Amino acid sequence: MSLDPALMLWSIPMKSTRYMQFALVSLFSVGLACAKADEPAKPSVHIYNWYDYIAPNTMSDFQKEAGISAVYDVFDNSDVMQSKLMAGRSGYDVVVASGDLLPNLIKAGVLKKLDRSKLPNWSHLDPEILAKLQSNDPANSYAAPYLWGTTGIGYDADKVKSILGPDAPVNSWDLIFKEENLAKLSQCGVAMLDAANEVVPIALHYLGLPYNSRNPDDYKKAQELLLKLRPHIVYFDSSKFISDLANGNICVVLGWAGGVADAQKASELAGNHRNLVYSIPREGAPVWVESLVQLNDAPNPEQGLAFINYMLRPDVIAESSNYLSYPNANKDATALVEQKIRDNPGVYPSKDVLDTLFPLEPLPLKIERVRTRTWNTVKTGA
């Protein structure tokens, strides 16, 4: 794929984070310069990650410390990534993958078991998060948890309360899924992620149905609900909401915590100083964990393990948490995360809130197709 920063800035959606040019340029300038012809080639590692989903200095620091040349490519959505890995011969050593994708990747023989003897920094990982990951990765054999987060509601507090009043249900999915509220909020713009594996489970959960339902009839009910809301949604997109929330083009989004945090920072940088807030609805919301995995056909497995071990260092992963406003899975890194991030309940939920969260899970292929058709119907409004 092209790694021209000027092109990438506008052509690749973000998982959840910054869109400022300085970060992009610093990220993609790392490790891409060719070695001098008269110098022996350095060992290398090829990384495949979400766009701008790592601290901007991490790759350069790793190269300096490890003496390993790094090539860093990005993907725009998990379907693209999964398809490339399933096809084989991707050329990547380490990939960042969502927990709900792990079972299919493991079953297909795409992933390589991690050699823990080469990962001394594994000891820093949080046992509770490792235990939760075992539903998708038994015995934590294949995945080293990286960052985690939730999918909830981002909103402009001033605009929402001016429209719905001081008692606006900002801590409930009613803000979006109750049509009378959404119709009123449409005057200032409401957007949703373009993510069937997150939005459809939320709709099912809101209806009191299993979020990971295997019943096709449940998806008809979710589709009916979402189609009622469709006329009031300005667009479905997983990156545009960040700039639009920052500049006031929208006032509500069903989105990610880190994206809303970035919108607030962008707003302040532009001098808008909007009162942007992220909330985890009291009814419950999806929680996801992104992990570092190694491919079975990785061309540089030793260098891949060196990179994973580097990312498991508390000081290293804390930099990404501080940059992205996402919690990490490293129990010894928490104290290194900025206090204002740790104190944000939308980023670091309380135990009571954590108990309401539900994990994204893989579905049987037949039901996955039903969910995809449901989502496509909702997006087109047909």
Can you name each region flagged by the protein language model?
Residues 243, 351-382:
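Conserved C-terminal helix/tail region of periplasmic/extracytoplasmic solute-binding proteins
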